[in-house]
Amino acid sequence: MTKNILEQDYMRYPKASDMPAFQKYFRKVQSTSFFPLQFIYKVIFRLLKEIRHIEISRTTKIGEGLYIGHAYNITINPNAILGKNINIHRGVLIGQTNRGGRQGTPVIGNEVWIGINVAIVGKVTIGDGTQ
């Protein structure tokens, strides 16, 4: 994880200050290996997750250029894979199915817009550019 990913995320917002604090610390926790700093980032990240009702693991694979509109009540399974330039809005669930023909987690392509209160569950693939 490099500084470039955080910069790409910043570019998706009109002003850098518009990026949700949750997202900033999500990327910082992913990219920092210096223990004292990583510990501080993890504490802040965990606090923001609780306040915003967001369940995204620091190990979740999300490409650069992430845009979170209204960062609240979002759940993404740690095994899901999200591409570059994804838009995610409040109430989104990206989850796992544990049985049946769609057992597994979603793979979401690049430049996908995921609207309010959308649930994507199971082993499905959402193609590039889907809205």
Identify the function of each model-found stretch.
Residues 1-53:
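Terminal amphipathic alpha-helical/low-complexity segments used for targeting or macromolecular assembly
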Residues 50, 54-131:
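Structural signal for interior beta-strand "rungs" in well-ordered beta-sheet cores
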